[in-house]
């Protein structure tokens, strides 16, 4: 079989035109790539991206730049997106038993979420003044248009939103004991009744920086929380956002 060698004729105008086309094509591809956070916007909901949790704590020893200790809890307030850290007894005394927060991110990698509830003994707000309730709705965030009945909230047994040990669990993520990686469960939305009677829908989306669709690297930066929520300000049960 003959090897055919084609003569090379370099034309600077042709090369320049080709480079321009390549640049335009590359730019078009970049524009076509969906920003995982931009697609979360619906014009009504509040979208929180890469909210840093306790990134200095570690579950095991020998992690560069991190300390082997429990993760500090942080609180979050819906009305003004305020993050409140609980690092010591003084912080606990100032905040935990008040109505000045709505959800608490606790436990390993701040992955265990509680609503502010004075009646549940393991809740950060136990013994305080706030009485919230939460219900898991197994449907996509955009399809949740109505809050459940008050009877359903009163009867709810959902206390902690964390690791889902099974599909029947109320948790928001699966956790692999082999890879030690968290993966948010699709079509899980949490309806919340706040102490002032307002209703909220909440979707916990990701615990990894940049909101990647999937993670295979155990060392991917975490916890950096992405979540979205909508508070119905008029007190009705209307939670439609699309």
What name fits each language-model region?
Residues 3-16:
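Bacterial N-terminal signal peptides that target proteins for export
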Residues 16-23:
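Sec-dependent N-terminal signal peptides
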Residues 24-28:
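C-terminal motif of bacterial Sec signal peptides marking the signal peptidase cleavage site
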Residues 30-242:
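Surface-exposed, beta-sheet-biased, low-hydrophobicity segments with strongly acidic/polar composition
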């Amino acid at each position: 079989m003959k090897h055919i060698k084609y003569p090379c004729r370099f034309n600077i105008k042709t090369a320049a035109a080709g480079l321009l086309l390549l640049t335009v094509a590359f730019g078009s591809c970049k524009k076509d790539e969906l920003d995982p956070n931009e697609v979360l916007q619906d014009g009504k909901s509040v979208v929180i991206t890469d909210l840093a949790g306790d990134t200095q704590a570690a579950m095991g020893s020998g992690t560069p730049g991190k300390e082997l200790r429990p993760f500090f809890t942080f609180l979050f307030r819906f009305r003004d997106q305020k993050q409140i850290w609980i690092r010591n007894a003084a912080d606990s005394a100032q905040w935990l038993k008040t109505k000045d927060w709505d959800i608490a991110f606790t436990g390993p990698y701040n992955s265990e979420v509680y609503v502010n509830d004075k009646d549940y003994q393991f809740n950060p707000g136990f013994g305080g003044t706030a009485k919230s309730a939460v219900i898991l709705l197994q449907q996509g965030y955009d399809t949740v248009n109505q809050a459940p009945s008050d009877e359903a909230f009163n009867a709810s047994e959902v206390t902690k939103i964390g690791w889902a040990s099974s599909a029947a669990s109320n948790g928001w993520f699966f956790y692999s004991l082999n890879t030690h990686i968290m993966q948010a469960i699709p079509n899980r939305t949490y309806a919340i009744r706040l102490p002032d009677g307002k209703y909220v829908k909440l979707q916990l989306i990701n615990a990894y920086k940049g909101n990647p669709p999937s993670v295979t690297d155990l060392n991917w930066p975490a916890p950096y929380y992405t979540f979205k929520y909508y508070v119905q300000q008029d007190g009705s049960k209307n939670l439609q956002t699309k």
